[in-house]
């Protein structure tokens, strides 16, 4: 991954003790007398020091970016798990705020089983909290990284869900504009959840959009040409790229740089793998059509032969959104028992205020996380041992026929769709706690109080200038109609945001262009230059308007007094681990040689590159031109018209950004652990007392084995000793978070090879074996593959 600057702290103290009003707005109140009420009535006791936001107990940070972070949380009243996106509004300019609220308002009107659901919006003066559905299976991107291409039967199950969700957006007159494997999540049952509507916008038949946004490998040719477009056709092209990626494990169009990629997209030539079926090839030809007028519509594509193979009796049809059931008496009775009145429940649901009442009602329609096989505080947020509902939206009597049979073949569980429309089966024996008198957030969310794993991502916010939307109005508040323009000018983002363009998740936008600034990216129908286009990535002003929210794989660069960059490792996401380690140029460790993770690994099962600039999402606004130079190893040449395997590109950083990092980072003094350059929790510091305390602990059981790299019948403790031995032999730093879980770090940040990952010994009850689970936390896929392969091959299990 490319290196990045440290991220500004999201100020979460603003939310202490706020009152939720009927319109969804929050009023900050005094702290006196509030915390006691929450402690008495919440599941957590007062002794539990975990911070809270509203009715949610925060569990851990699962993502972090320039202006936002994402936390896994548990709804206190129902026990359901959610993802909370916390956005620091003070870091966003008015345009960014406008786009942020547009994203929220669009999410409110989308109700589809394969789209991430919004439950609640909490807004204070400085912070916006979006409580959303938690998809525990991670990204399709990461799934492909771990497994390579899908078999067509599995790809079909996923793709039917994707097409259904995108077609639903189109029939709602919403265009996503940033469809890619990174924005497709998987729930616990391996069902698709489309996320990140930061670039989405309303389209109107007869009017054109002209914003160039999206990830370049997924972008339609008309976007590269600077042409205006209706909307849906750019999503259709992106879906074609996604289909190709699912089936082949590689991208149809790729290049060493943006110029080469653009040429290949405009040429429209791509390689058909020998294993791809004729029906799949024919379907691709309906998606990847250079002329947008001749490109197929999703309604037409839903009738395609490949789409419906094996589903002849359940032909894919447009999703019919059932009427929302807001009168489920069973849920209402439970909420009355929690302390809500019938009147306020009916008022909130009838107006869909997306306040704490709406959220509680919606979450009651979901399977309780307390029935999960493993504790939510488990270190692996990708554990598939969790069993959660796919959605609260499907209705057994009202859903489209295709949803009955669209379960992924990789899932061994039946889809669970606890409906908000027909009413879920809620166990009557569950004792729900009463709510506190006011919705409080008695949290002191210090960075050292909530240890979090820093992860690279784009900033969260708006996406450049977009045309006024009749549906969305000009409101800056997602819970109200139009409100007056903000009087206070937002804080100017610091220059350290400039490095955000170096990671794959950063988004830049060529906003709706006037004649004066069209030349910034397209000049006379031609691309001006690669360096000019990528100058947007280095522009702080550009990045303050970005909004992508899977905030992961963060690395920070520090500049020493001598001018040599040092790599700052992020803090560990466990109790009290707030130390960091620095790898100086003198402490660089050699890059591991490349090996395949297992003998069964084929060239198809290769890693996607994450850090390349060309893999980032575009939404670049016209900025002052700058040149950007790139370092790192030269990329190997690839064949023209060939589909490039997703591991063959290399991360490229922008060296002229280093000077921008100095101001923030030179103020920070290294800690004792940083001076030592090694984690305290390495094997050299594991005390015998700790081993005695954990001697009786048992490995976590996993139902699924797709994240396992090796299995063994050896005793788990002996396996851990062998793992530590191999890590030491490969000069890896590591910290033992749990009895059978290690957090590992390897690489030289100066060479962009720093990798962080987890290794966990897990029990595989179905196989009567133990396995070693590898999970990448940050770093490029190639660097992770190198070190993971080397370690896996050296383990003598």
Swiss-Prot record:
- Under the GO molecular function aspect, what terms does this record hold? ATP binding; protein serine kinase activity; protein serine/threonine kinase activity; tau-protein kinase activity
The name this protein goes by in its record: MAP/microtubule affinity-regulating kinase 3
Q: Which residues carry this modification: Phosphothreonine?
A: 211, 602, 617
Query: PTM comment for this protein?
Result: Phosphorylated at Thr-211 by STK11/LKB1 in complex with STE20-related adapter-alpha (STRADA) pseudo kinase and CAB39. Phosphorylation at Thr-617 by PRKCZ/aPKC inhibits the kinase activity.
What does the entry list under GO cellular component? cytoplasm; dendrite; plasma membrane
**Assigned EC number:** 2.7.11.1
Q: Does the keyword ATP-binding apply?
A: yes
Compositionally biased spans, kind Low complexity: 374-385
Q: Spell out the activity regulation.
A: Activated by phosphorylation on Thr-211. Inhibited by phosphorylation on Thr-617.
Q: Sorted alphabetically, which PROSITE patterns does this protein's record hold?
A: KA1, PROTEIN_KINASE_ATP, PROTEIN_KINASE_DOM, PROTEIN_KINASE_ST, UBA
Q: What is its main location?
A: membrane
What membrane topology does the annotation report for this chain?
Peripheral membrane protein
Among Gene3D superfamilies, the record links this protein to: DNA helicase RuvA subunit, C-terminal domain, Kinase associated domain 1, KA1, Phosphorylase Kinase, domain 1, Transferase(Phosphotransferase) domain 1
Q: Which reaction does it catalyse?
A: L-seryl-[protein] + ATP = O-phospho-L-seryl-[protein] + ADP + H(+); L-threonyl-[protein] + ATP = O-phospho-L-threonyl-[protein] + ADP + H(+)
* SUPFAM superfamilies named among the record's database cross-references: KA1-like, Protein kinase-like (PK-like)
Q: Belongs to which family?
A: Belongs to the protein kinase superfamily. CAMK Ser/Thr protein kinase family. SNF1 subfamily.
Q: What does this protein do?
A: Serine/threonine-protein kinase. Involved in the specific phosphorylation of microtubule-associated proteins for MAP2 and MAP4. Phosphorylates the microtubule-associated protein MAPT/TAU. Phosphorylates CDC25C on 'Ser-216'. Regulates localization and activity of some histone deacetylases by mediating phosphorylation of HDAC7, promoting subsequent interaction between HDAC7 and 14-3-3 and export from the nucleus. Regulates localization and activity of MITF by mediating its phosphorylation, promoting subsequent interaction between MITF and 14-3-3 and retention in the cytosol.
What positions does UniProt annotate as the active site of this protein? 178
């Amino acid at each position: 991954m490319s290196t990045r600057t440290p991220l500004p702290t999201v100020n979460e103290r603003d939310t202490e003790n706020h009152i939720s009003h009927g319109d969804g707005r929050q009023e900050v109140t005094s702290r006196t007398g509030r915390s006691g009420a929450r402690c008495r009535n919440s599941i957590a006791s007062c002794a539990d020091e975990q911070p809270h936001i509203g009715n949610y107990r925060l569990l851990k940070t699962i993502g972090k970016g320039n202006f936002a972070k994402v936390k896994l949380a548990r709804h206190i009243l129902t026990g359901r798990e959610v993802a909370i996106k916390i956005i620091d509004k003070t870091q966003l300019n008015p345009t960014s705020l406008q786009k942020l609220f547009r994203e929220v308002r669009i999410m409110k009107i989308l109700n589809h089983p394969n789209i991430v659901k919004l439950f609640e919006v909490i807004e204070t003066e400085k912070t916006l909290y979006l409580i959303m559905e938690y998809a525990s299976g991670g990204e399709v991107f990461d799934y492909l990284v771990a497994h390579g291409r899908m078999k067509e039967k599995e790809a079909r199950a996923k793709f039917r869900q994707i097409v259904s969700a995108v077609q639903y957006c189109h029939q709602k007159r919403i265009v996503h504009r940033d469809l890619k494997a990174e924005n497709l999540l998987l729930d616990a049952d391996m069902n698709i959840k489309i996320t990140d509507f930061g670039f989405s916008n309303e389209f109107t038949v007869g009017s054109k959009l002209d914003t160039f946004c999206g990830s370049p490998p997924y972008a339609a040719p008309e976007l590269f040409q600077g042409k205006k477009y209706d909307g849906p056709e750019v999503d259709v092209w992106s879906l074609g790229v996604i289909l190709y990626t699912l089936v082949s494990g590689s991208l149809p169009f790729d290049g060493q740089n943006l110029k080469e990629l653009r040429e290949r997209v405009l040429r429209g030539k791509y390689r058909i793998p020998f294993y791809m079926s004729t029906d799949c090839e024919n379907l691709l030809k309906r998606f990847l059509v250079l002329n947008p007028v001749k490109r197929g519509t999703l309604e037409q594509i839903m009738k395609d032969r490949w789409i419906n193979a094996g589903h002849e009796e359940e032909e894919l049809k447009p999703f019919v959104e059932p009427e929302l059931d807001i009168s489920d008496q069973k849920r209402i009775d439970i909420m009355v028992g929690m302390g809500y009145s019938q009147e306020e429940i009916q008022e909130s649901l009838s107006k869909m205020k997306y306040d704490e009442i709406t959220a509680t009602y919606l979450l009651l329609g979901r399977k309780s996380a307390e029935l999960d096989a493993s504790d939510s505080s488990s270190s692996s947020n990708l554990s598939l041992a969790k069993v959660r509902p796919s959605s609260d939206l499907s209705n057994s009597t009202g859903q489209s026929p295709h949803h009955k049979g669209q379960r992924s073949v990789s899932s061994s569980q039946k889809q669970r769709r606890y409906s908000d429309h027909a009413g879920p089966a809620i166990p009557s024996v569950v004792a729900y706690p009463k709510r506190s008198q006011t919705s409080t957030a008695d949290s002191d969310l210090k960075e050292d109080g909530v240890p979090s794993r820093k992860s690279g991502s784009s900033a969260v916010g708006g996406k450049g200038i977009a045309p006024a939307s009749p549906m969305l109005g000009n409101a800056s508040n997602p819970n109200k109609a139009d409100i007056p323009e903000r009087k206070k000018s937002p804080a100017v983002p610091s220059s350290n945001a400039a490095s955000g363009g170096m990671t794959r998740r950063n988004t830049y936008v060529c906003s709706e262009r006037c004649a004066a600034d069209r030349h910034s990216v397209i000049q006379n129908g031609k691309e001006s230059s690669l360096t000019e286009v990528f100058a947007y990535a280095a522009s702080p002003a550009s990045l303050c308007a970005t909004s992508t929210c899977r905030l992961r794989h963060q690395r920070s660069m520090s500049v020493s007094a001598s001018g040599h960059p040092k790599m700052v490792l992020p803090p560990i996401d466990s109790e009290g681990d707030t130390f960091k380690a620095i790898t100086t140029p003198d402490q660089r460790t050699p890059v591991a040689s490349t090996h395949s993770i297992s003998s069964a690994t084929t060239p198809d099962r290769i890693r996607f590159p994450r850090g390349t600039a060309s893999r980032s999402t575009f939404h670049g606004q016209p900025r002052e031109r700058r040149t950007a130079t790139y370092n790192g190893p030269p990329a190997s040449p690839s064949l023209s018209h060939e589909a490039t395997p997703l591991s063959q590109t290399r991360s490229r950083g922008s060296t002229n950004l280093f000077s921008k990092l100095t101001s923030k980072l030179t103020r920070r003094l290294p800690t004792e652990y940083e001076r030592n350059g090694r984690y305290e929790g390495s094997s050299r510091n594991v005390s015998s007392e700790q081993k005695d305390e954990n001697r009786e602990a048992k490995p976590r059981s996993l139902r699924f084995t797709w994240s396992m790299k090796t299995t063994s019948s050896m005793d788990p403790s002996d396996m851990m000793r062998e793992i530590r031995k191999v890590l030491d032999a490969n000069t890896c730093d590591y910290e033992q978070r749990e009895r059978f879980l290690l957090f590992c770090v390897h690489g030289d940040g100066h060479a962009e090879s720093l990798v962080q990952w987890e290794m966990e010994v897990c029990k595989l009850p179905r196989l009567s074996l133990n396995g070693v689970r590898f999970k990448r936390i940050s770093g490029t896929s190639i660097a992770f593959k190198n070190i993971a392969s080397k370690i896996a091959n050296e383990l003598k299990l």
